[in-house]
Amino acid sequence: MMSGDYLVIDKRVLPDVYEKVLFAKKLLKDGKVKEITEAVKIAGISRSVYYKYRDFVFDFAETSEGRKVTYNIIFKNEKGLLSNISNYITEKGGDILTINQGIPLNGYANLSITIDLSTVDGDIKTLTEGLLNIRNVEKVEFIGME
């Protein structure tokens, strides 16, 4: 019985649509195209396929430096909360590589954070759930993994 929401699967056994979605995302990320319409045309998929899978398909790579994950976190703008988030990550063994907080609007702040997972105690699911359990953290969105 499997637990968790993520699987690592060799792309050779999956329909090619998933790899095409990744290709379209890469075209956009690298700035080779500016519009989704252009990216999906080059990748050979429909816009509906792109929108259906874009938030669920990620490229996975193991590097010599370790695994890196990027999150987008929405939290109530409260004194000390950013510190609580960073303390939680370091307590779990994570190394914060980049952190960028947007200007708080309507009482909420947006945080983009990249973490080196190579020394984290536990798995990515546990880390994500722990971030969600921090008081006044409203949303933790998994952006990607390298």
Swiss-Prot record:
CDD domains: ACT_PheB-BS. Residues 70-145 form the ACT domain. PROSITE patterns: ACT (PS51671). Pfam families: ACT_4 (PF13291). SUPFAM superfamilies: ACT-like. Belongs to the UPF0735 family. This is UPF0735 ACT domain-containing protein Cbei_1295. It comes from Clostridium beijerinckii (strain ATCC 51743 / NCIMB 8052) (Clostridium acetobutylicum).
